[in-house]
């Protein structure tokens, strides 16, 4: 799979089918199980800064695609042919010197991904951060949160615009521009507040009269900059005031009965935050950063009543349609999502609670705006603390936050777009590229991406038109399909840029070219696409059976590409390009994306939101965790994700993306407890203990959200974090130091045996 990694490094794209199958109208499409699709990372860092071009792109007059290496150039006539619509376009005067030995950079063969600087003369706008803080917390948790906020504020640039809102049963909007004392405006948490009501109550039109018509949006459209600066102002101007307000901030003063939950109006607070940003900074790089410590119990967006006797909804309640608050809350957050997308703003949620806070309902607003979600047990936990630090820091290890993105696609006429599964919102740009079948955000060829970073990855799903007969192949002018992805965005330095990626993939008749299709099959990308499709279908199709769907897809794919003798299971084999795919499917069936019964709706929503925005390599770790062995007998090495890998004299490091587990075998644990690693004559043992911790620290420093670290011993209570991910052994195996795992799940070998029998019979 190294060659697919090279393609990803160049263009940020991984496709399950790198040679695309085409079928006649009388045949079953091979891609009906794993669709023709692409996992694309729009802002993957370029290999060379020379591919940043300081001018505007040259576009086709007919289809608006951008000049690219696959364009056919006629130097004598000084024009170029578009590979998408075949229209010929003249070069403008500034391209008059184009020649075979004097090509512009966008025509170089390796320039399949280039970036254009769209407004080199405009002044960059500063980022805006509006903090929305839940005060219905115990004092210890609030102190943890305040400590992290102080650290975050110190990391933000002085030019960034800051604001503060707090909430319990009331919402407080702080006037940070008032220098004499702490001043805030109160809003009741029981009812929604429109933008006009908000502006009236915040006295925005005392000095300047309210416009009689038109949209009130920012200093240019009805609001004075002085009024805006009362609530949202540069960090350098409000640093002292904001620190003072946070230092004085106490937990909610309202008494809470022992059998009740606190009155928490999360929905109203977020609505007020969105309206304030929409009025003051529309279309700017603004983020609402919400810090939530429990479930919303009051006003729009509430997910449960205040009585503790009323349990928070479970998966079973949602499936049976007996979750009383769920649908109303989702409807409210869908409305909030539309408002934020229209304004171009991002919602980030940092949830820290042992209880559910409503991530399942908030999911639509966070996902459609491209926001982050972090789920931790406490505001003092490193998962929250380090993740917040990564969002706010700038420099070598930052996330590369960008904003105000618009993603568009062009492709060959026989390809239609079914949709995108990922952090974006449809712009409802209908046209000939749109398929009748919608997957995820469908029925459009353009999407809004309010927030995106260097790792944000979207899954595009395509539909390939069937041909009448195989004779059409012989008459075809070209056996290439072309795709062009265009991403407009505001860079973290304030520049507006356009990233253009143009791809070419060969197509073949599926049933006649199985070997060629097999050679171009990327099984890692296929597993990730399957995981996204399953998760999306489980969210939108109540009767969907994920195990049956994925099993059918695997059986059909292996039937197409497997080599076997009829009736002889032992003869079955797959080529190296597909040999690991059944193993991926086995682990996908057992993963948190399919098996939701052991997780809350909030946890399931959290896992899926992270899956929807991560690249292939990170997503594969979520599906099939990696296991590394550390011992005296060999250097660190990856080993099978199997119970047989446990040994008394071995340390294991499990990486399941969300959790890192350092597991000490029983002998290693005894030596550690005896303190041998502190003795000079046992330095080698000390190095052995430290080695997995160094590996884990490296992973934690590069990953977002920061994973949870669990350090445990064999036979200890927390060893369950490792054992739950391991493949159970068959029967009564006798491995040295092996733990017994009692489970209803079949082992990988039994799963593969059943697969072989089904295929050959």
From Swiss-Prot:
Topology of the protein relative to the lipid bilayer: Peripheral membrane protein
Transmembrane feature ranges: none
Compartments in which it is found: Cytoplasmic vesicle, COPII-coated vesicle membrane; Endoplasmic reticulum membrane; Membrane
Region Zinc finger-like, residue ranges: 60-85
InterPro entries xref list: ADF-H/Gelsolin-like_dom_sf, Gelsolin-like_dom, Gelsolin-like_dom_sf, Sec23, Sec23/24_helical_dom, Sec23/24_helical_dom_sf, Sec23/24_trunk_dom, Sec23_24_beta_S
Family, per entry: Belongs to the SEC23/SEC24 family. SEC24 subfamily.
Protein's recorded name: Protein transport protein SEC23 C
Organism expressing this protein natively: Arabidopsis thaliana (Mouse-ear cress)
Gene from which this protein is expressed: SEC23C
């Amino acid at each position: 799979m190294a060659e697919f990694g090279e393609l990803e490094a160049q263009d940020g794209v991984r496709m399950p089918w790198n040679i695309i199958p085409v079928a006649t109208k009388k045949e079953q499409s091979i891609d009906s199980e794993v669709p023709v699709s692409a996992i694309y990372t729009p802002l993957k860092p370029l290999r060379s800064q020379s591919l940043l071009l300081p001018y505007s792109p040259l576009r086709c007059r007919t289809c608006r695609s951008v000049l690219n290496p696959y364009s056919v150039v006629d130097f004598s006539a000084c024009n170029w042919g578009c590979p998408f619509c075949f229209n010929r376009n003249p070069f403008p005067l500034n391209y008059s010197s184009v020649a075979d030995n004097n090509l512009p950079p966008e025509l170089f063969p390796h320039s399949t991904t280039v970036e254009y600087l769209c407004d080199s003369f405009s002044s960059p706008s500063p980022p805006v951060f509006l903090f929305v803080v839940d005060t219905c917390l115990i004092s210890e948790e609030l102190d943890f949160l305040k400590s992290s906020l102080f650290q975050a504020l110190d990391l933000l640039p002085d030019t960034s615009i800051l604001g503060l809102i707090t909430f319990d049963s009331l919402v407080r909007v702080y006037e940070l521009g008032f220098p004499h004392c702490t001043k805030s405006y109160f809003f009741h948490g029981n009812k929604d507040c429109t933008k006009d009501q908000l502006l009236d109550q915040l006295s925005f039109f005392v000095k300047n009269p309210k416009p009689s018509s038109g949209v009130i949006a920012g200093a240019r459209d009805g609001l004075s900059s002085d009024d805006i600066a009362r609530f949202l102002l540069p960090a350098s101007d409000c640093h002292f005031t904001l620190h003072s307000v946070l230092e004085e901030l106490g937990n909610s003063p309202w008494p809470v009965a022992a059998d009740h939950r606190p009155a928490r109006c999360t929905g109203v607070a977020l609505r007020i935050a969105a309206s304030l940003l929409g009025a003051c900074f529309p279309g700017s790089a603004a983020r609402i950063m919400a810090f939530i410590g429990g479930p919303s119990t009051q006003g729009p967006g509430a997910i449960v009543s205040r009585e503790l006797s009323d349990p928070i909804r479970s998966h079973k309640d949602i499936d049976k349609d007996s979750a009383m608050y769920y649908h109303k809350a989702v409807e409210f957050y869908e409305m909030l999502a539309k408002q934020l997308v229209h304004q171009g703003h991002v919602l980030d949620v940092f949830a820290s609670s042992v209880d559910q806070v409503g991530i399942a309902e908030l999911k639509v607003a966070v996902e459609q705006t491209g926001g982050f979600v972090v789920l931790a047990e406490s505001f003092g936990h490193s998962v929250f603390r380090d993740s917040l630090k990564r969002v706010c820091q700038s420099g070598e290890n930052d996330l590369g936050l960008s904003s105000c993105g618009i993603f568009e696609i062009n492709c060959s006429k026989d390809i239609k777009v079914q949709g995108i599964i990922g952090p974006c919102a449809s712009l409802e740009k209908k046209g000939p590229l749109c398929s009748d079948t919608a997957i995820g955000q469908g029925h459009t060829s353009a999407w809004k991406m309010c927030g995106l970073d260097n790792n944000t990855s979207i899954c595009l799903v395509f539909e390939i038109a069937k041909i009448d007969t195989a004779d059409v192949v012989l008459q075809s002018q070209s056996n290439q399909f072309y795709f062009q992805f265009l991403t407009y965005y505001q860079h973290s330095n304030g520049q507006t840029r356009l990233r253009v990626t143009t791809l070419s993939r060969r197509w073949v008749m599926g049933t006649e070219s199985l070997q060629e299709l097999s050679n171009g099959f990327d099984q890692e990308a296929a597993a990730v696409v399957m995981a996204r499709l399953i998760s999306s279908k489980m969210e939108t199709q109540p009767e969907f059976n994920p195990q049956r769907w994925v099993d059918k897809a695997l059986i059909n794919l292996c039937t197409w590409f497997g080599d076997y003798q009829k009736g002889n299971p032992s003869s079955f084999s797959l080529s190296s390009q597909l040999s690991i795919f059944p193993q991926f499917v086995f682990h996908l069936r057992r993963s948190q994306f399919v098996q939701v019964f052991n997780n809350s709706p909030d946890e399931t929503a959290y896992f899926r939101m992270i899956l929807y925005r991560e690249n292939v390599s990170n997503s594969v770790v979520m599906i099939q965790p990696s296991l590394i062995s550390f011992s005296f007998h060999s250097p660190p090495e990856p080993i099978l994700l199997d119970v047989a890998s446990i040994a008394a004299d071995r340390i294991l490091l499990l990486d399941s993306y969300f959790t890192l587990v350092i597991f000490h075998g029983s002998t290693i644990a005894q030596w550690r407890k005896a303190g041998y690693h502190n003795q000079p004559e046992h330095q080698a043992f000390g190095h052995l203990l430290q080695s997995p911790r160094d590996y884990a620290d490296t992973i934690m420093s590069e990953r977002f959200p920061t994973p949870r670290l669990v350090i445990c011993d064999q036979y200890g209570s927390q060893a369950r974090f490792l054992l739950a991910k391991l493949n159970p052994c068959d029967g009564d195996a006798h491995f040295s130091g092996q733990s017994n795992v009692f489970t209803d799940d079949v082992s990988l070998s039994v799963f593969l045996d059943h697969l072989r029998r089904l295929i050959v019979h």
